[in-house]
Regions:
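Signature aromatic-anchored transmembrane alpha helix within multi-pass, membrane-resident enzymes
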Residues: 197-202, 294, 303-306, 312-321, ...
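Membrane-interface coil-to-helix junctions
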Residues: 4-80, 106-124, 128, 159, ...
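Periplasmic/ER-lumenal interhelical loops and adjacent helix-loop junctions
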Residues: 206-291, 369, 374
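Perimembrane helix-loop-helix junctions
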Residues: 167-201, 288-301
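Hydrophobic, aromatic-rich transmembrane alpha-helices
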Residues: 176, 182, 276-306, 310-323, ...
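Extracytoplasmic
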Residues: 30-31, 408-529
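Hydrophobic alpha-helical membrane-interfacial segments at the cytosolic entry of transmembrane helices
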Residues: 151-152, 187-213, 225-233, 238, ...
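Membrane-embedded helix bundles of polyisoprenyl
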Residues: 4-6, 73-91, 95-180, 196-210, ...
Length: 655
């Protein structure tokens, strides 16, 4: 717990303004979607993961949704350590070895990375608890052990979907490995196994019944929720991912990013954070070699030993060879590693199929098979604890020194910098500045409305609104009047091409810089014009080159213009040029007479009007006398848009 508090200190100082975790793959929408779920009344739906969702919603009632997200994630670290420690002690690790394994698992790169984006996947404590309940039940299937197994199975499944998948796939391997490594030597072993399997079967039937009742579509038509098979290659681990340093590492993170960039891994980089560390690999290898040597020495010629420790007489050893956990852990780790890989790989002309290829037709709604790496991390940590204990328990000083050095190196490989594990819940410093102003502002954010940006309005309590189909062009001439009429007092532009454009045209466009930050600017709106454009139709999205920007028009287009007061003589001056050849442009205000302009292929300013405007909205229509031309037909650039005229800067003036 103390280690968690130290790592999360920057977040704990402002738990409702900052969130835990390094921003490995940018501002993804997942954490903010979960926060919004916590803010709503508690409910269950198709995508609910009840144990995590209801816990987060309950915490949010007292702390708020952002802080609830942080607490839910942070609590998973000490809980994962406790669960791993209990499992380690059950497997007969010494207290020191169990503590090392618990810390390595709790603060593994996988857990730290997932905690930044996926609070459900970060609930890794349920995996070791499930294995503990399973293996304890195989030792002695008492009523309480069966009840604990049922509860652990429900917890690992209802905490997150991937936990249920991992448990379901690896349970047969975990049972087989534990049976051959230990359980078969216990009293009434076959009976204990039968009771355990029966309990699991009953829990599985109950789970299917629950899904059938709450979301029958999942069973009837699994393809309705399926991901594309190609996603499995992006979100599955590479075998060498387990050896690459985590990108959040304070010293080696830059090297890791360069490795992933050279391998063209971008979208799936988060799922590749499954590094176990070279020192952990070495310690685990020492544990395996130590077990193999002990097994070889004791296989013949020593007294047979029962599970209760009594000597049964000379001959081959029939009890588990100590430390008995090593082959169990190695077997589960190996299968989990293979399950975490992509569906197939071709080597030397031969295509090798992997478990994810077999699982995809059965459960096509899963794609991030790299998350099996959580079990690899757990098994590797336990093996490392055993290996470290073996080295530190030897009488040879050199071996003890190597053991201590490897433990220190493991800590260094898993090290993170607390400041890098904290980020603002808002996307830029400009957004934070807006929220710090004493007077409530109404700010227009030029960022398009996407899944990643949709949370901004909610997080700012409605102070900041994003670009939409009505307001989608921050480089539009005389934008200030339009935004002012819509109730906005400020304009926020992030670090895009629009930022330098607005800096250059601020005064002329009726905006003035109020706050400048490295990642965004905030402008106050002071409109210069009484005529503004409320809506635009028939134009393609704005383009830009250098200091100029424009929008291409199709064959017909329109502006909805608004003036709060009557304007008897208004002139519109607009920079235009025709596409490819000169064209005639007809312009009409409402139902009035047409004005025809002969627009050349070279850009220049044209005057429309004078126009007589009454107070209120008016429709200004544009019509190309010649049909719009497909760009690709003329300049063979692959552009299939139909173009007629380009409209650049414009200006209204009164006479």
């Amino acid at each position: 717990m103390l280690l968690t508090l130290a790592l999360a200190a920057p977040v704990l100082r402002a738990p409702s303004d900052r969130i835990f975790g390094a921003e490995i793959v940018g501002r993804h929408h997942d954490p903010f979607t979960v926060m919004q779920q916590f803010a709503r009344p508690m409910s269950l739906g198709l995508y609910s993961q009840p144990l995590t969702d209801l816990t987060g919603a309950a915490i949010a009632r007292g702390t708020g949704p952002v802080a609830a997200y942080n607490w839910l994630v942070l609590l998973s670290f000490p809980l994962s350590a406790i669960a791993a420690y209990l499992l380690a002690r059950h497997l007969a690790l010494t207290p020191a070895a169990a503590l090392l394994a618990a810390l390595l698992f709790a603060f593994s790169p996988f857990h730290v990375a997932q905690a930044a984006y996926h609070p459900h996947v970060a609930q890794t404590q349920w995996l070791p608890l499930y294995l503990l309940a399973l293996w304890r039940c195989m030792d002695k299937a008492s009523g309480s052990a069966i009840a604990w197994l049922a509860a652990a199975t429900a917890a690992v499944t209802l905490s997150n979907f991937y936990g249920g998948l991992i448990a379901a796939v690896l349970t047969p391997i975990a049972i087989a490995a534990y049976w051959f490594g230990r359980a078969r030597f216990g009293p009434h072993a076959s009976r204990q196994l039968a009771l355990t399997l029966g309990a699991l079967g009953m829990v599985a039937l109950a789970g299917v019944a629950f899904v059938w009742r709450s979301a029958p579509g999942v069973l009837i038509d699994r393809s309705a929720l399926r991901f594309e098979r190609g996603d499995l290659f992006r979100f599955s681990a590479k075998w060498w991912s387990y050896l690459v340093p985590p990108v959040a590492h304070p010293l080696l993170g830059g090297t890791a990013r360069r490795i992933w960039a050279a391998s063209d891994v971008t979208v799936g980089m988060l799922e590749q954070q499954v590094s176990v560390g070279w020192s952990v690999v070495v310690l685990g290898t020492i544990a395996i070699c130590g077990w193999a040597a002990a097994f070889s020495r004791r296989r013949f010629g020593e007294p047979r030993t029962r599970m209760d420790g009594r000597v049964a007489g000379p001959g081959p050893r029939v009890g588990p060879s100590g430390p008995y956990a090593v082959p169990i852990l190695a077997a589960v780790a190996g299968v989990a590693l293979v399950c975490s890989l992509s569906p197939e790989r071709t080597a030397f002309g031969v295509r090798f199929m992997r478990p994810s290829a077999l699982l995809y037709p059965i459960v096509p709604m899963f794609r991030a098979y790299a998350r099996f790496g959580a079990i690899v991390q757990l098994m590797a940590a336990l093996l490392a604890g055993i290996g470290a204990a073996q080295l530190l328990a030897t009488r040879r000083r050199a071996a003890r020194a190597w053991g201590a050095a490897l433990v220190v190196l493991a800590i260094a490989e898993y090290a993170v910098w607390p400041q890098s594990l904290s980020r603002d819940v808002l996307p830029t410093a400009a957004h934070r500045w807006v929220m710090q102003q004493p007077a409530p502002l109404r700010v227009f954010d030029c960022e398009p409305l996407t899944a990643e940006s949709a949370s901004v309005s909610w997080l700012t309590g409605g102070r900041v609104a994003l670009a939409d189909r009505i307001h989608d062009d921050c480089a539009e001439p005389q934008l200030a009047s339009r935004l002012w009429a819509s109730g906005f007092t400020h304009l926020l532009v992030r670090d895009t091409w629009e930022r330098p454009w607005l800096d250059d045209h601020a005064g002329a466009e009726g905006i003035h810089l109020d706050a400048h930050f490295a990642d965004a600017d905030v402008f106050s709106i002071v409109p210069n014009d009484l005529v503004y454009i409320a809506a635009i139709a028939g134009f393609w999205p704005r383009e830009h080159r250098g200091g100029a920007s424009w929008r291409w028009m199709s064959g017909d287009a329109s502006w909805t213009i608004v003036t709060p007061t009557p304007q008897p003589r208004v002139t519109l001056e607009v920079e235009m040029h025709a596409f490819h050849v000169a064209r005639a442009l007809s312009v009409r205000l409402d139902d009035g007479p047409e004005q025809t302009l002969d627009v050349a292929a070279k850009a220049r300013a044209y005057r429309i009007g004078p126009l007589a405007l009454t107070a209120g909205p008016h429709l200004l229509t544009f019509h190309s006398a010649e049909p719009a031309t497909t760009a690709d037909d003329v300049i063979a650039n692959g552009d299939r848009r139909a173009l007629s005229f380009s409209l650049g800067a414009w200006k209204w003036s009164t006479e």
